[in-house]
Amino acid sequence: MATLMNPVRDPNTLSNYNNWLCTHTTANFEIFFEEKKLVGNVVHKLRSITNAETDEIILDSHHVDIRNVQVAGLPVKAWELLPPLGPYGTALKIKLENPVGLNEIIDVDIAVQTTKECTALQWLTPAQTSNKKHPYMFSQCQAIHARSIFPCQDTPDVKCTFDFNITSPLPVIASGLPVRSTSTVPQSGVKTLHRFHQKVPIPSYLFALASGDIAEAAIGPRSVVATSPDKLEECKWELEADTERFIKTIEEIIYPYAWGEYNVLILPPSFPYGGMENPVFTFATPSIISKDRENVDVIAHELAHSWSGNLVTSASWEHFWLNEGWTVYLERRILASLHGEKYRHFSAIIGWKALRDSVEHYSHDHEFTKLVPNLKGEDPDDAFSTIPYEKGFNFLFHLENLVGKEKFDRFIPHYFTTFKGKSLDSYDFKATLLDFFKSDAEASRLLQELDWDSWFYKPGLPPKPEFDTSLADVVYELAGKWRSLPESPFQPQPSDIQGLTANQIVVFLEQILLFERPLTAELSKLMGEVYGLTGSENIEVANLYLQVGLKAADKSVIGPTTDLLGRIGRMKFVRPLYRALQKVDRQVAIDTFEKHKDFYHPICRGMVEKDLFGKKDA
């Protein structure tokens, strides 16, 4: 009966969140660097959403060491870990002695510590940090890894407020606003309690912690950058010119920023993503610090998540495009406001290439190439690709062109107001869009005639939009000259790329990678030398040039490739480089992975293992 009243929308949680709703979580943890574990307890305030119709609470958990459980301040003996169920872990079942009425709230206090199998935490030795002085720890809970830190309702369909009470000998950052105290600044090595409060309800995947040798510098009136002290000045320079401009621009598109501060933590290089939109503190890869301010698009993306994803959230990972497609759309709207509409289209062209690559990797009829895939029984990490980002963007871009940009602009704040603080699925989105335009006969007709089922459920590539290619044409032309070699008289010169942005060089290299007949090893080497690509500090450029060299079977790039694979853990670079390297020399690829696998985050390590040794669904 309860299940019918409150249907579960998320197939990737084992929790009975259709019976109980977490309204607040207090996380009390001490960080033990030597033992590489967190020890403490979590207190969940759970509100009953049935009227005494269930006598058990089921929470997601995976590889956690549970010491004891209390409900309403009293010890509970009748708790157990259920048998493991694939990637979803071993759910914690707590039996209640007394029924709980509708809307009554109970406190569930769980003493817990993490284990070495925890998939959410990465522990770095001092040698793995930039100044090599102190150990470092950071979390990455998306998609379903929060359950490996503490038992919880690990689903984006549930949001609650948070208090963090974290004890550590080193500075701490969390996904809440710091509770500033009047006490003196803690001394390094002395265990100190760090408190944070998150007043905006967030899903479990946005629970975030980091601790290490971290210093901060202001990059705007409501923003700081935090990173290793030896990298602070270069990170400050990279971000201070654009961060506040980005915030003001997106506030004009939607409505004011809701989280108080917008800060950026630049993590050590093993962080597996470009960025993670943890509230208050975006966690970002050091690969954006390119010393030319050309890679800060990542910050525009993570900032946009403060509305799409963090305030308005997909109800399950099957509807992940509602987080990422919207965020890419908003990121490109920010860039268009600052740099012009041509820049938005140019960014979309780069995105289309990434989308095509992902579809080809999976195959055109694969479930994971759908905008709304079926993830029942699947690990959401296996479905992680550019597809929800770029297919989602292209759907929203199509809707914008369908009804007209001016009309769609009015829908944007309406949508983000309607679902503020809530989770939704694709059907909620469709219903809201249709309802908004019902009084506009023309827009309503166009939306009713739209083939929604094809957009949601058809695998492969969507229809390709007409992009403004003006910023791309110059690099298409240059790529065409390289395609004509060695037969043509074209002689490459450094002036060929003079005045091009890093993103234009990225598109140029992506065009080279599309050649049906790869460059010869000699031409690949010539390109690197003449255009200065071999020593580029911009990893977006360097990694693509290495892929060009590997595709050309240029043995001279194998060394730089293995070197880069030992310096960066961002999956965007690591996975394609390993795939390309193994085609040239599989043993070198395997040896490189074995050498560096402990450097990579567990999520990245697992995905590369699948790429090198396992199933194609990765």
From Swiss-Prot:
Required cofactor names: Zn(2+)
Catalysed reaction equations from the record: an epoxide + H2O = an ethanediol
GO MF annotations in UniProt: aminopeptidase activity; epoxide hydrolase activity; metallopeptidase activity; zinc ion binding
Gene Ontology cellular component list: cytosol; fungal-type vacuole lumen; multivesicular body; nucleus; NVT complex
Enzyme class at the top of the EC tree: hydrolase
Chain sites annotated for binding Zn(2+): 301, 305, 324
Pfam families: Leuk-A4-hydro_C (PF09127), Peptidase_M1 (PF01433), Peptidase_M1_N (PF17900)
UniProt keywords, alphabetically: Cytoplasm, Hydrolase, Metal-binding, Metalloprotease, Nucleus, Protease, Zinc
A GO biological process held by the record: lipid metabolic process
Function per UniProt: Aminopeptidase that preferentially cleaves di- and tripeptides. Also has low epoxide hydrolase activity (in vitro). Can hydrolyze the epoxide leukotriene LTA(4) but it forms preferentially 5,6-dihydroxy-7,9,11,14-eicosatetraenoic acid rather than the cytokine leukotriene B(4) as the product compared to the homologous mammalian enzyme (in vitro).
Name this polypeptide is given: Leucine aminopeptidase 2
Organism: Emericella nidulans (strain FGSC A4 / ATCC 38163 / CBS 112.46 / NRRL 194 / M139) (Aspergillus nidulans)
